[in-house]
Amino acid sequence: MADKKPTAENWPVVSGDYIVGDPESPVAVTTLASHNEDIPAAAGAAIAGPCKTENLGIEKVVANIISNPNIRFLILCGAEVQGHITGQSFKALYENGCDPEKKKITGATGAIPFVENIPMEGVERFQQQLELVDMIDNEDGGAITAKVKECIEKDPGAFEEDSLVIKIDEERYSKKSSFVESSSESEKIESEA
């Protein structure tokens, strides 16, 4: 069995519309505009749910992934979100990161592709911790189940670094502030984007 690490306390750390499975599973699944999260959850995903926006939605997914070092794969499946183009924005963030000052996702084509509450440390951790699996526009339950199981079989073990917790204050979202805490170092950093 692959080596595992503890998740952040009270994982998932950010609320949302998702199903939580085994926190030691190496797979997270974003069903984009589709609501078939029960399929990947039943197949063994750690967490599965829709993500409809290319800003706060992506921030929530990133925060929940990097706070669980056992997650090593993010499967993007389900219907692409029209206008927001959330799946493509995830791919752009993973492949290109974002502008360190403006926090715009480099190469994203969505309407408002900004990750203003995720510090660069969080973006880099997202890029390093996992492998992105592109099944955008695929809603086939059998194919999604097979891919989740395939990723579980390829589990490389937990990411070498401990949980990285990013707290997103949704009520103050427009103020663009975030707090980062490394679970191994209990230091807090406030960043203004």
From Swiss-Prot:
It is found in: Cell membrane. The keyword Membrane applies. Its main location: membrane. Its cofactor is 5-hydroxybenzimidazolylcob(I)amide. Residues 174-193 are annotated as: Disordered. One of its GO terms (molecular function) is cobalt ion binding. It comes from the Archaea. GO terms for biological process: methanogenesis, from carbon dioxide; methylation; one-carbon metabolic process. It is a single-pass membrane protein. Binds 1 5-hydroxybenzimidazolylcobamide group. Its EC number is 7.2.1.4. It catalyses: 5-methyl-5,6,7,8-tetrahydromethanopterin + coenzyme M + 2 Na(+)(in) = 5,6,7,8-tetrahydromethanopterin + methyl-coenzyme M + 2 Na(+)(out). Residues 1-38 are cytoplasmic. The chain crosses the membrane at residues 39-58. Keywords: Cell membrane, Cobalt, Membrane, Methanogenesis, Methyltransferase, One-carbon metabolism, Transferase, Translocase, Transmembrane, Transmembrane helix. InterPro entries: MeTrfase_MtrA/MtxA, MtrA. One of its GO terms (cellular component) is plasma membrane. 5-hydroxybenzimidazolylcob(I)amide binds at residue 84. Belongs to the MtrA family. Part of a complex that catalyzes the formation of methyl-coenzyme M and tetrahydromethanopterin from coenzyme M and methyl-tetrahydromethanopterin. This is an energy-conserving, sodium-ion translocating step. The complex is composed of 8 subunits; MtrA, MtrB, MtrC, MtrD, MtrE, MtrF, MtrG and MtrH. This is Tetrahydromethanopterin S-methyltransferase subunit A 2. It comes from Methanobrevibacter ruminantium (strain ATCC 35063 / DSM 1093 / JCM 13430 / OCM 146 / M1) (Methanobacterium ruminantium). The lineage of its organism: Archaea, Methanobacteriati, Methanobacteriota, Methanomada group, Methanobacteria.
